[in-house]
Swiss-Prot record:
Taxonomy of the source species: Viruses, Adnaviria, Zilligvirae, Taleaviricota, Tokiviricetes
Binding site for ATP: 30-37
Ranges where the Helicase C-terminal domain occurs: 208-375
Source species of the chain: Sulfolobus islandicus filamentous virus (isolate Iceland/Hveragerdi)
Occurrences of domain Helicase ATP-binding (ranges): 17-182
Record-listed E.C. numbers: 3.6.4.-
The protein's name in its UniProt record: Putative helicase 7
Amino acid sequence: MVKMSIQLNEFQKKALQSFLMSDKNLLITAPTGTGKSFLAMLMAMETKSRVVYTVPLRALALQLNDDFHNKVAPLVNGYADSVALTSEVYEEDPENLEERVIFTTYEKADAIFRRHYPWTDRIETLIIDEIHNIGDKERGKAIENLIAYAMNEGIRIVAMSATIPDVNKIAEIIDAEIIKTDERPIPLYKAVKIGNKLYFEDGDVIELKEDFIKKMVRKNKVVMIFTSTRKKAEELYMIYDRKFQNKVAFFHAGLDAETKLRLLEETRQGKYNIIVSTTALSQGVNFPFYAVVFDDLKLPIIEYGRFTGWKQITPIEFDQICGRAGRPGYDEEGLCIIEATDIRQAEKLKRTYFNTSYGTITGHHVLEDFLLALISKYIYAKPDRIMEATKHTISFRNISEELVKEKLEELKNAKLIGEDGTGYFVTLYGRAVAESYFDVKDAITYHDVLTKNNVKEEEIINAILENENVLNASKGENVNIIFNSWIKGVDEKTIVKATKNMTLNDLNKLVQTLSWQTYGVYRITKALGKKELADKLRLLFLEIRYGVPASALALVQLPGIGRKRAIELMRNGIHNKTELCSQKEISKKIIGEKMVKVLCK
């Protein structure tokens, strides 16, 4: 056992002992602030073979990897042999990964398992942080896949969350010992605020002598103000920034990972007292908040990138956000406040969000997607192994063998899998779909377009632009206009300025989604044996990935050039390294004499 220079709390001691003294799977349920992530990293440190630590966000994977190196390893006199894998789901990863501990997202881990890298055979432990996301319509699918893979292969599972509904059901699915505590090392007090009075969940009432936010700034505390949308977050930021200059920041999904990590570090250093945020901060990112104030309890419903209405925050979502308050090492207590207009509303809010149960958990997986992922993972699978895997899911644990056979037959008819009489195997086409992380529904749509007689490239592009994932990433903007502007090399800021709601990070996410879909379609086309068409799609993928026309691709891939300079060189008649070096005077004006010397030596 590693030697530690810190004292563990009783909950951590019990959980670590269970991990070390047995090989059981563990389901750990404990409030935010009890040190679950630190505990899981200690477990990773104690595991001799490979560990995959999965989380909901890339930013969180990067943060945990950083903490593993800079905080956990020094405390236990250990070596942080780890890496964060945060590339896109469709992108390849190293065939021979050296690091022992991998921090990544659920989806990336799922994609990795499908690709049969040699190093995945040595995975001993799978850590699933924020396991409550198994009930999420989008995130839950990957978690269910990961659990099925792990249970089928004897990989140990450690699952954790502060807000687990149906604890016993999840424990049964992963065959886990439950380790539970309700005690927070830092007490969290919940209250409803009406005017200048705080009505606490235990019945106490406190009258505030000054504005609450003003008091927090004066006492140098950090407050998170939760609101429903980015636009509202930025509006509240402007209001508070006028009152408390340079002490306010906003945080939402439109910010890139680097900016999010910078805000976290600057807040820890005391630069900000007020962070206005959307639900982007509900998933484990460890800001030092003393208080969380709910400006709103609604969330927007977005379908195909467009706003369609509102929904109330669920008790799980509320507690995930509320639990950000009161962090060990920063405060001795935490405070969570909901704004209300009158006593009647306050009592209703208390009943809904204070001391409430989380209800039941429902799976949202699609059976044919699960089956294709499973068969692709194993390359070949017999019916009994497939049925055994369904027992370890929320979505299919009680499914009939007849329905599974029916869906397997549909996958066969779609030529995604084949059968040899005793089991099922994945076809080249099916493997291309699974490794591209495509839904079966989308794959069939693309297949129908690709196999048309004399299909034109424009038809394939239209199918990509009409894909649900692309539309969801578009924020309701005109995808055709953005797509054409991007591959022609139009400046990013110019593209964003022409939209209603996009940020630069939104544009980046849309480009990533377009790249993912295009590369996947290229993979499928190649698997179908359509080489000429595949070559065209490979070129289209590169145009989207780099944001330049084909005539500038040779330039943009040169070290140090980048998109903006490649476009400028192209507009000056330079299209490749040979032309760049033969027209040095023009090149020097655009990329500088030093870079010309480096590239042309």
